[in-house]
C-alpha cells in the first residue's frame, strides 16, 4: 500500500481591519459620509500609515487624474453639500440636547406611598433599561421602564428617591447630563370623588 498524503495545513493570517472612530466605517468609505474632514483628521492622528495610503499627495493626484473636469467639479460640490448638511445636523443635535430637560417627578400613589418617575434621559444618549437596572441596584428598590400615556418611555422607581436620583445621575452621568438640564417636580395624585 502507498502512503496517504497528509493535507498541508496553511496558517491563515487574520486581517486587521481599521474602523474610523468618527463614522465607524472603514477609512476607504469615509468619503461617502458627511463627516469626511473629521474622519481624515482622526485617521491622521490614529493611523498614520493608512492616512498616507489614502490621503497622500500622490494618492489624491492619481485618483483625480482619472476624472474629467466636470466630474471633479460635481464631486467637489457634492462633498461641500454633504459637509454642510453634517455640520447643520450636528449643530441641531447639540441644540436639542442643550434644550432637553430630564424630569424627575415624585408621584404620590397612596396615602404614604410614592414613586419617582424619570423622563428625558434618551435624548442625552442614555439607555433607559440600563439606567433603570442601575437605579434598582443602587437604591435597592423596584425599577422599571414603562411607556407613559403620551407614548414616551419613562423610568419608574419605587419610593421617594427623587433628590438621591438627581445626585446619582450627576455623579455617574455628569459628562452627558449637565446639572442645569435636570428638573425636580412634585406631582400629587388628584383625589377621585366617590
UniProtKB/Swiss-Prot annotation:
PROSITE patterns reported for this sequence: SUI1
Keywords: Cytoplasm, Ribonucleoprotein, Ribosomal protein
KW Cytoplasm (keyword) present: yes
Domain SUI1: 102-173
Gene Ontology cellular-component terms listed: cytoplasm; ribonucleoprotein complex; ribosome
Metal-binding is among the record's keywords: no
UniProt cross-references to InterPro entries, sorted A to Z: DENR/SUI1_TIF, DENR_C, DENR_N, SUI1, SUI1_dom_sf
Principal place of residence: cytoplasm
One of the protein's GO biological processes: formation of translation preinitiation complex
Domain of life according to the entry: Eukaryota
Localization per Swiss-Prot or TrEMBL: Cytoplasm
GO terms assigned for molecular function: mRNA binding; translation initiation factor activity
Protein family according to the UniProt entry: Belongs to the DENR family.
Binding partners and assembly: Interacts with the 40S ribosomal subunit.
Entry text on domains: The SUI1 domain may be involved in RNA binding.
Protein name per Swiss-Prot or TrEMBL: Translation machinery-associated protein 22
Amino acid at each position: 500500500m502507498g502512503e496517504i498524503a497528509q493535507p498541508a495545513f496553511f496558517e491563515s493570517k487574520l486581517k486587521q481591519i481599521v474602523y474610523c472612530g468618527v463614522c465607524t466605517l472603514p477609512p476607504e468609505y469615509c468619503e461617502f459620509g458627511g463627516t469626511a474632514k473629521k474622519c481624515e483628521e482622526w485617521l491622521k492622528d490614529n493611523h498614520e500609515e493608512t492616512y498616507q495610503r489614502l490621503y497622500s499627495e500622490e494618492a489624491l493626484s492619481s485618483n483625480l487624474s482619472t476624472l474629467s473636469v466636470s466630474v471633479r467639479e460635481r464631486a467637489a460640490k457634492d462633498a461641500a453639500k454633504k459637509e454642510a448638511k453634517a455640520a447643520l445636523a450636528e449643530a441641531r443635535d447639540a441644540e436639542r440636547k442643550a434644550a432637553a430637560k430630564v424630569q424627575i417627578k415624585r408621584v404620590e400613589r397612596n396615602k404614604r406611598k410614592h414613586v419617582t418617575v424619570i423622563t428625558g434621559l434618551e435624548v442625552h444618549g442614555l439607555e433607559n433599561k440600563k439606567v433603570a437596572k442601575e437605579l434598582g441596584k443602587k437604591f435597592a428598590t423596584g425599577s422599571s421602564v414603562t411607556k407613559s400615556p403620551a407614548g414616551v418611555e419613562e423610568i419608574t422607581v419605587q419610593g421617594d428617591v427623587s433628590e438621591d436620583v438627581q445626585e446619582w445621575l450627576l455623579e455617574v452621568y455628569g459628562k452627558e447630563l449637565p446639572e442645569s438640564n435636570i428638573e425636580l417636580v412634585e406631582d400629587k395624585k388628584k383625589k377621585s370623588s366617590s
